[in-house]
Amino acid sequence: MEPPAAPSERSLSLSLPGPREGQATLKPPPQHLWRQPRTPIRIQQRGYPDSAERSETERSPHRPIERADAVDTGDRPGLRTTRMSWPSSFHGTGTGGGSSRRLEAENGPTPSPGRSPLDSQASPGLVLHAGATTSQRRESFLYRSDSDYDMSPKAVSRSSSVASEAHAEDLIVTPFAQVLASLRSVRSNFSLLTNVPIPSNKRSPLGGPPSVCKATLSEETCQQLARETLEELDWCLEQLETMQTYRSVSEMASHKFKRMLNRELTHLSEMSRSGNQVSEYISNTFLDKQNEVEIPSPTPRQRAFQQPPPSVLRQSQPMSQITGLKKLVHTGSLNTNVPRFGVKTDQEDLLAQELENLSKWGLNIFCVSEYAGGRSLSCIMYTIFQERDLLKKFHIPVDTMMMYMLTLEDHYHADVAYHNSLHAADVLQSTHVLLATPALDAVFTDLEILAALFAAAIHDVDHPGVSNQFLINTNSELALMYNDESVLENHHLAVGFKLLQEENCDIFQNLSKRQRQSLRKMVIDMVLATDMSKHMTLLADLKTMVETKKVTSSGVLLLDNYSDRIQVLRNMVHCADLSNPTKPLELYRQWTDRIMAEFFQQGDRERERGMEISPMCDKHTASVEKSQVGFIDYIVHPLWETWADLVHPDAQDILDTLEDNRDWYHSAIRQSPSPPLEEEPGGLGHPSLPDKFQFELTLEEEEEEDSLEVPGLPTTEETFLAAEDARAQAVDWSKVKGPSTTVVEVAERLKQETASAYGAPQESMEAVGCSFSPGTPILPDVRTLSSSEEAPGLLGLPSTAAEVEAPRDHLAATRACSACSGTSGDNSAIISAPGRWGSGGDPA
């Protein structure tokens, strides 16, 4: 593991709003706000108009959330707490009512006549408990102190957020819930000091006379209690004064969480170069920063690389058209015998065996894709719709359903390593399991379930394999069309709904107008929530809602309005989209290989255009293990622990798997030795880094050319100018096949092919020094697009940098080869090269 580096001016610092002029810094919350009496939360079930005809089994066909690799143990085991601990690999040590509202008719079945959502006979779908039952539970960074300068003698040590089972306490961290808890405390203290009993018919559960009589308290104790009550009321007023009329209460939590994450990332970025890059990746991806993005002006040399080919310019389409749509003709008889799982396959028995785990967490979607002939999305979508009886409930013709599924899957790019139909199928199946959570049984209507499943299926359709920021920085037509706001998410929605207009593809043709409008609104809200820059806002919204109910007396989460219901659904799809780290390790590692391959392909495009390479997109410097540990610690764990609070205890096994996977990647970091001295900034062969905010860890273009210049090799510019002649000779990275191919083999092959193509002496190649540390994980090489193979729907994007950067990539591979020549092929640190991405996103 890399030794901690001294803090520098290059550390991460987000521009978050500070106190207004003349306003003092907010005081820390009173100490007791971190521990509140535990209040169970119940999510009220909706009623069924046909409840007399539906048995309990029919209403809940998927009651338990099971893991695909779990063993049947009979009765549900006792509640266990997550073993997740605060990350210690980067810095420091571990730390731990109102009246009921009737649902509108277009939103699915209405409550039964005479049965109110508040009816006492409605059994709860959820009971939430925070804290531990058998062991201490350490939480995410959200439960750490919000202030580094909290030195008040009244403040307790907040380094540990362990809830005490003996005292039955909940931990409250969202500001609005803390304000409510504070007001309740003030009310209780007032009752005690004045001997005025609290009416039992009011909201507070502390009805009746105070538990302690004022006469039993000394004068000094009463005065101290009065002072503390006044201080608490002042704190509460100060919190309310900072609120702005146009901001929701959950924005208080969002602002707080962003501030805390900023502090954690700053610490992480100061520890090592790789930590700096991980910090920037998390900041750029998961924080919706409103500050302007400064794009440096390209040099004349770089500008030549950014000119799109003339053939691309001629293909420009009017802005009014939705790009990426293809005219497809699906042959075969859709009106005759319908396949059992919606797709034709000669391995139906094996497919049926895999689909026995359809309603379990951890289904091996890779095996499903293999047995379904690469049609994993169509197979999963059809099977789920059949199992939930949605085709009959909404009168969806089977042939229309099959036509839409096939058309939708064909609009996912098979040559994109991660965001392909395989990922869509995985998110769809995960959403299906989360909808079947026992805590949410009988909560959502059939139309809401249909909307959630449809949103999961289309949420990444026509994804080009690059990020929103890449599209914005390159002035793509999509970014212009959607004004730089959730560019890809808006495009996915447009394509998903546009495909419904294709011949015999409208699966919602028999819905009423109001049902279609309601479904469309829900789908739009859920897909837009998959924009990762909205992550902290979604997390703050959900946590505020959960904790607000914890500090209220009722503890009943009614979900009786659209805002609350869609909030849960949005977070559900978001959780499914970020569920890879919660799956069995063998599946998680495959997803990690794929996302890194996609990142590196984007990095190659950025390098070709002379752009700054995005964090984690440089295949020469990215740290896969550290990125995954940081991803879990700062993004995935806080989200899933909040979801686990909502559906407690149903997500306990998911949290356990998440921790196991995090430990595996963390142990891989420990096995990696520190980079050699000459690799550190300011070391041998490297100039000192500039004193400015800069996360980029790759060598500058000019420095690379100077240090890697080898006689007999053309320069990058010369290669580009002679591109037409060189393409036939350049190394074709798409020919590097086989998931078992090691980088050593790839490097040896590249050495031979490049020497043949450019006449470079082999001796001069091996004379180049090695800058890779022996323990650095070898990252997967990716398939690159040919010059005529552009990302559909993204006009003006040239091919990747394989042909242009072949000499430099060869040198990097040669250096990796000499550094790792003694590495065994069984070493877990070696990540196999994924090779070409075949049908359905599977490796060919």
Swiss-Prot record:
Species lineage: Eukaryota, Metazoa, Chordata, Craniata, Vertebrata
Q: What is this protein called?
A: 3',5'-cyclic-AMP phosphodiesterase 4A
Composition bias, kind Basic and acidic residues: at what positions? 51-78
Species annotation: Rattus norvegicus (Rat)
Could you tell me the EC number(s) of this protein?
A: 3.1.4.53
Q: What does this protein do?
A: Hydrolyzes the second messenger 3',5'-cyclic AMP (cAMP), which is a key regulator of many important physiological processes.
Which residues take part in binding AMP? 419, 423, 460, 577, 628, 631
KW Magnesium (keyword) present: yes
Q: Which residues carry this modification: Phosphoserine?
A: 13, 147, 152, 160, 204, 333, 672, 674
Upon changing residue 147 to A, the result is: Abolishes phosphorylation by MAPKAPK2
Residues binding 3',5'-cyclic AMP? 419, 628, 631
Q: Where along the chain is Mn(2+) bound?
A: 460
List the gene name. Pde4a
Q: Where is the PDEase domain?
A: 343-672
Record flagged with keyword tRNA-binding: no
The record describes its quaternary structure and partners as:
Interacts with LYN (via SH3 domain). Interacts with ARRB2.
Family under the similarity heading: Belongs to the cyclic nucleotide phosphodiesterase family. PDE4 subfamily.
Query: Where is the sequence biased in composition, kind Low complexity?
Result: 36-46
InterPro entries per the UniProt record, alphabetical: HD/PDEase_dom, PDE4_UCR, PDEase, PDEase_catalytic_dom, PDEase_catalytic_dom_sf, PDEase_CS
Binding sites annotated in the UniProt record for Zn(2+) 2: 460
Residues at which Zn(2+) 1 binds: 423, 459-460, 577
Q: Name one GO cellular component term.
A: perinuclear region of cytoplasm
Q: How is the cofactor bound?
A: Binds 2 divalent metal cations per subunit. Site 1 may preferentially bind zinc ions.
